Design a protein with these regions (language model features):
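Short coil/loop residues immediately preceding or within conserved phosphate-binding loops
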Residues: 54, 65, 105
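Conserved structural core of kinase catalytic domains
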Residues: 108-139
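Generic structural signal for beta-strand residues in well-ordered domains
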Residues: 46, 60, 72, 100-103, ...
Length: 140
């Protein structure tokens, strides 16, 4: 996957603003979240991945958030961004569960979290669901 990194200030511009404050970006929320990213040490983002939202490619989208590639302290990481319409008020519980899974070597390694973001190890490769489907087919 080609990784073109942009400064996190790119989130201020259309269409990237829809990723940091999905689904309805507002300037005040975008500014607040960019400050939050800076405090976490995130400097750059890359809009690449198999999923397309608006005109942006991202790694993933779910019920709680969107996942993009980012740089934190010059290291490539996966950045989960809490959706503004998420029923969860923060990423604390998700971070806690990831730390528990990490204790038995499951999942990407937890790095850091804040109210709206979860930073974890980026593992380049096949999605686990796709791998499992292939393995199931081979087993038959």
């Amino acid at each position: 996957m080609i990784q073109h990194f942009q400064p996190i200030s790119a989130f201020k511009k259309d269409p990237y603003d829809k990723i940091i404050a999905f689904p309805k970006p507002r300037d005040a929320e975008i500014k607040k979240r960019i400050i939050e990213l800076k405090k976490l040490g995130v400097s750059h983002v890359s809009f690449t991945g198999p999923l397309r939202i608006e005109k942006c490619q991202i790694l993933g989208k779910g019920y709680v958030g969107m996942v993009v590639l980012a740089k934190q302290n010059n290291k490539v990481v996966a950045l989960k961004i809490r959706r503004i319409d998420s029923p969860r008020k923060n990423m604390t519980n998700e971070a806690k569960l990831l730390k528990i899974a990490n204790k038995i070597n499951i999942g990407p390694k937890f790095i850091k979290n804040s109210k709206n973001f979860l930073i974890m190890e980026y593992i380049d490769g096949e999605k686990i669901i796709d791998w499992a489907k292939k393995s199931e087919t081979k087993a038959k």
